[in-house]
Curated annotation (Swiss-Prot):
Sugar-modified residues: 83, 95, 137, 166, 178, 368, 376, 393, 398
Positions bearing the site annotation: Important for GP-C-mediated membrane fusion: 33
Name recorded for this polypeptide: Pre-glycoprotein polyprotein GP complex
Binding site for Zn(2+) 2: 458, 460, 466, 496
Spans within the Cytoplasmic topological domain: 33, 457-496
GO cellular component, one term: host cell Golgi membrane
Originating gene: GPC
Domains as described in the record: The cytoplasmic domain of GP2 plays a role in ER location. It also contains a zinc-binding domain that allows SSP retention in the GPC complex by accepting a cysteine from SSP as the fourth ligand.
GO MF annotations in UniProt: metal ion binding
Site (described: Cleavage): 58-59, 262-263
Amino acid sequence: MGQLISFFQEIPVFLQEALNIALVAVSLIAVIKGIINLYKSGLFQFIFFLLLAGRSCSDGTFKIGLHTEFQSVTLTMQRLLANHSNELPSLCMLNNSFYYMKGGVNTFLIRVSDISVLMKEHDVSIYEPEDLGNCLNKSDSSWAIHWFSNALGHDWLMDPPMLCRNKTKKEGSNIQFNISKADDVRVYGKKIRNGMRHLFRGFHDPCEEGKKCYLTINQCGDPSSFDYCGMDHLSKCQFDHVNTLHFLVRSKTHLNFERSLKAFFSWSLTDSSGKDMPGGYCLEEWMLIAAKMKCFGNTAVAKCNQNHDSEFCDMLRLFDYNKNAIKTLNDESKKEINLLSQTVNALISDNLLMKNKIKELMSIPYCNYTKFWYVNHTLTGQHTLPRCWLIRNGSYLNTSEFRNDWILESDHLISEMLSKEYAERQGKTPITLVDICFWSTVFFTASLFLHLVGIPTHRHLKGEACPLPHKLDSFGGCRCGKYPRLRKPTIWHKRH
């Protein structure tokens, strides 16, 4: 752990070296390419298949492709069609004979028959929507009838007026449309009957050619509609939201001051009584569709301190001794200093001179401490430790006579330079970075092998589409048991 922390702390330092940058680049490329190869090999998909097999059969979502899936949405009208004041009207039909419209707190019975209960001479004619106030006691009933009339296609300016019973009479409310297939109302009757077909799917037209036919609307609760508005009738009539949507579309030109339909699937931000509520009144309740909503400084003296088997080092020791002696005897006279120096030099050099004299007598090359040779590296300026140029028979040796010596020194110089460079690089390149580069390369090689081989990810029914997310067994059935075993041949498939 400490090595890893040190590695991250030294990132700004070792990135100054080109080699380190290369190692980092190689590591990143190897890791990224390795992950891509693993993904393309199908290993991840195969593991997901084993982990998730049989666990997604009940979610109702079928995956068709990589980014496409089969889904569904349920249209709910519960809040929209609730029986509250000023809610939208909703429609239902019972046995193709009785039609009902629920508007606010009121329910209306709609029938088509050949019986006329109203007469123009004795009842109220409705020429415009305001006249509905003479027929119905409650304003919420008036706007519902007004809306329904518009949905049927009634034109208040051009079409014949409707008839209604005056609200002061005890018999109850009644509104009548003449939709006969005769006389001068033939075209108007056809338009109203077509409106009924749009509002109520499966509407049966009982009108006969050449005979009278009327569409009547009664408010449930009045004496004239009591027999058909009981709970036994209304409980059997299931309000159909599709019919209601047809009703909304056909009534799109009708404006209601208490709630206005702004768009097909949205409402204005008001409360249930129509008062403005800036910021919304639980908007989800008013929607038709609600959703479940990253050199080492090696001087000649330093080398001689490590190795003293060189004539040059002997001479350096002599010079160094003399220098120290002069510092020690600084207050003595010059004569005494010279005498001491000569004495010391004689004591130190007697042994060397004796050895050289013996070598001279035996014709063996020796050093007279006057000339030295060394090997120099012309590019870097580094050189070897100077060595004495030997003498034999009074003359210096030819370079060819000690060729092996200077070739060996050259090899030592090169080795020393390489060792120095290696040590420098070792100091600047963390071992952790080298390890990362090595193992990332191994990871890339292994992933490349898996990518070339390929791993199957899931079963298919032979010759059919991808079954995801349903995981098939060898018999072609879903592992979770939602679908039976088809006993069709299956094949392992790579990707989908």
